[in-house]
Amino acid sequence: MKAILFASIVLLCFSSTVIGGEHLTIATEIVQKAKSECASFEGGKFNTTEQTITLHDFTGDGRPEEIVDASQFSCSTSASMWGGSGGTFLWVLVDGKTHEFLAHKWRVVDVDGQKVLLLAVHSSECSDTLGPCYRALVWSDGFRTIR
């Protein structure tokens, strides 16, 4: 009986990891790759914050998608490994796909129940060199963006 109970618990834990962990695995791989890149550059020491991976339900299906924010990375031997004047890398993991962006800042806002990712991007993305430029991104029946 104990063996059956133990097997059931292991199976339940494993199934939740597989079902709910698909994006987590991708997010973790992104962070691990960054850690490896840091270490390979003059033996750098890699650090992240608790805000490195955040959860947001962009598709409205009740299952949160993940954002991996490289502005939360630091490497002791490089100040600009994951960004520069164009912004810092931001990865959004939706439906098994990784969307990569550069952004100076970002925020998720709710517009009538729809989660919208706002990115403050380099002004050249708005075809000029003056003032702020923003992108609004939504994932509803696919991926859409506007600048």
Which residues make up each language-model segment?
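Acidic, small-residue rich beta-repeat scaffolds with periodic aromatic anchors
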Residues: 4-5, 20-43, 105-147
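Beta-propeller blade signature
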Residues: 88-95
